[in-house]
């Protein structure tokens, strides 16, 4: 059993999270900006099936993270990046990105991105905490991701590939701008083969939470991402110049 939280109640100590299922910490509360910011600041995130479950809060251990400067770009992906004619934008289509990530996929029975989740994260986007990366090719969305930046941490929430390798390209684009955005570490939450192939690693909860304490101020300010459009060669050059 996990504790039931009323809105505004503090989260339990993450060391009390279950090991089966791994990381389940609490249920209840709400998806208000204050609740979400308090949760992410301590390494807790919501993940649940809105059709059959209350809001569930998680803190898995170990934690899947990506040190963006060590992101692995395979030879095939590098060739794809050289050949493709991509345009990259940040925060130009946040709701579209979320809805794209919420679309049904062949290997999944459904989506955890409900309308309530969409509304909550769009509100965080309006407040300057949630952000998106969009990859465009021939005017269509080819890949995307979104997440939350608090201080020097980026908490990745979801990514999608409407076109081949699109989410990988979005992750490389985020890597290319990480220095300018002052992002030190990407929280990928839960291990999966796609992320591990790009250099993700599993970090003990104690080490992960030490990074949170170091890189997230007690009152994290909104972050402002670039509003320009970037052709892929320009973004690659910008990464090398930072």
Curated annotation (Swiss-Prot):
* GO MF terms held by the record: leucyl-tRNA--protein transferase activity
Q: Where in the cell is it found?
A: Cytoplasm
Does the record's keyword annotation contain Oxidoreductase? no
Annotated coiled-coil segments of the chain? none
Q: Which reaction does it catalyse?
A: N-terminal L-lysyl-[protein] + L-leucyl-tRNA(Leu) = N-terminal L-leucyl-L-lysyl-[protein] + tRNA(Leu) + H(+); N-terminal L-arginyl-[protein] + L-leucyl-tRNA(Leu) = N-terminal L-leucyl-L-arginyl-[protein] + tRNA(Leu) + H(+); L-phenylalanyl-tRNA(Phe) + an N-terminal L-alpha-aminoacyl-[protein] = an N-terminal L-phenylalanyl-L-alpha-aminoacyl-[protein] + tRNA(Phe)
Q: Which UniProt keywords apply?
A: Acyltransferase, Cytoplasm, Transferase
Predominant subcellular localization, coarse grouping: cytoplasm
GO CC, one annotated term: cytoplasm
Enumerate the InterPro entries for this protein. Answer: Acyl_CoA_acyltransferase (IPR016181), Leu/Phe-tRNA_Trfase (IPR004616), Leu/Phe-tRNA_Trfase_C (IPR042203), Leu/Phe-tRNA_Trfase_N (IPR042221)
One GO biological process term is: protein catabolic process
Record EC number? 2.3.2.6
Q: Does the keyword Cytoplasm apply?
A: yes
HAMAP family, from UniProt?
Leu_Phe_trans (MF_00688)
Would you identify the family this protein belongs to, as annotated?
A: Belongs to the L/F-transferase family.
- What PANTHER family has UniProt attached to this entry? LEUCYL/PHENYLALANYL-TRNA--PROTEIN TRANSFERASE (PTHR30098), LEUCYL_PHENYLALANYL-TRNA--PROTEIN TRANSFERASE (PTHR30098:SF2)
The UniProt function text for this chain reads:
Functions in the N-end rule pathway of protein degradation where it conjugates Leu, Phe and, less efficiently, Met from aminoacyl-tRNAs to the N-termini of proteins containing an N-terminal arginine or lysine.
What is the name of the protein in this document? Leucyl/phenylalanyl-tRNA--protein transferase
């Amino acid at each position: 059993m996990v504790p039931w939280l009323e809105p505004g109640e503090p989260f339990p100590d993450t060391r009390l999270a279950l090991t089966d299922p791994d990381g389940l910490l609490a249920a209840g509360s709400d998806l208000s900006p204050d609740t979400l910011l308090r949760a992410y600041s301590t390494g807790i995130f919501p993940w649940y099936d809105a059709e059959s479950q209350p809001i569930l809060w998680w803190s898995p251990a170990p934690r899947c993270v990506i040190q963006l400067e060590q992101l692995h770009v395979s030879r095939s992906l590098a060739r794809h990046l050289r050949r493709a004619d991509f345009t990259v934008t940040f925060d130009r289509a946040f709701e579209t990105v979320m809805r794209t990530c919420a679309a049904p996929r062949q290997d999944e029975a459904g989506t955890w991105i409900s309308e309530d989740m969409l509304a909550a994260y769009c509100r965080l986007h309006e407040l300057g905490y949630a952000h998106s990366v969009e990859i465009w090719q021939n005017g269509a969305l080819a890949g995307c991701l979104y997440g939350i930046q608090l201080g020097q941490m980026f908490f990745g929430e979801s990514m999608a590939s409407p076109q081949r390798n699109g989410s990988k390209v979005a992750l490389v684009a985020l890597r290319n701008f990480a220095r300018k955005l002052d992002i030190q570490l990407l929280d990928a939450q839960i291990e999966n083969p796609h992320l591990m192939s790009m250099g993700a690693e599993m970090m003990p909860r104690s080490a992960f939470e030490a990074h949170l304490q170091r890189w997230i101020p007690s009152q994290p300010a909104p972050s402002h991402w670039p509003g320009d459009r970037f052709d892929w060669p320009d973004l690659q050059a910008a990464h090398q110049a930072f």
